[in-house]
Amino acid sequence: MAETSGPTAAGGSTSSTVTTESETQPEHRSLTLKLRKRKPDKKVEWTCDTVDNENLGRRSSKCCCIYEKPRPFGESSSESEDDDDCCESAHCIRGHKKATSGSKETPSSHHDKTGSMQH
């Protein structure tokens, strides 16, 4: 700190100047950004070979209508003996048939040798 004073020529008054020096430390601020991957919109998209099995202009991922056989109260769905991947009805436009043991497969068949579906 410095102070100066001195007489003036006309009025006899004095003036003073005060100088203050202070050390200012720069502020160190840090900013952290957390980037997150944008979640994709959840939507169903059908390919051109998806079947419209009800002829209503809608598409479905299954080739046949889903029918659940009525079962007695208390019987779980895992106890059912008819756990087929497709139906045998005439309206199945992909021609799926129930695989029988010992039957020969044709090259155009959708089944592999274990009898499971391939799509």
UniProtKB/Swiss-Prot annotation:
Residues 1-23 have a biased composition (Low complexity). Keywords: Protein phosphatase inhibitor, Transferase, Ubl conjugation pathway. GO terms for cellular component: nucleus. Signal peptide: none annotated. It comes from the Eukaryota. GO terms for molecular function: protein phosphatase 1 binding; protein serine/threonine phosphatase inhibitor activity; ubiquitin protein ligase activity. The keyword Ribonucleoprotein does not apply. It catalyses: S-ubiquitinyl-[E2 ubiquitin-conjugating enzyme]-L-cysteine + [acceptor protein]-L-lysine = [E2 ubiquitin-conjugating enzyme]-L-cysteine + N(6)-ubiquitinyl-[acceptor protein]-L-lysine. Pathway: Protein modification; protein ubiquitination. Its EC number is 2.3.2.27. Residues 107-119 have a biased composition (Basic and acidic residues). Atypical E3 ubiquitin-protein ligase which ubiquitinates TLR2 at 'Lys-754' leading to its degradation by the proteasome. Inhibitor of protein phosphatase 1. PANTHER family: E3 UBIQUITIN-PROTEIN LIGASE PPP1R11 (PTHR20835:SF0), E3 UBIQUITIN-PROTEIN LIGASE PPP1R11-RELATED (PTHR20835). This is E3 ubiquitin-protein ligase PPP1R11. The lineage of its organism: Eukaryota, Metazoa, Chordata, Craniata, Vertebrata.
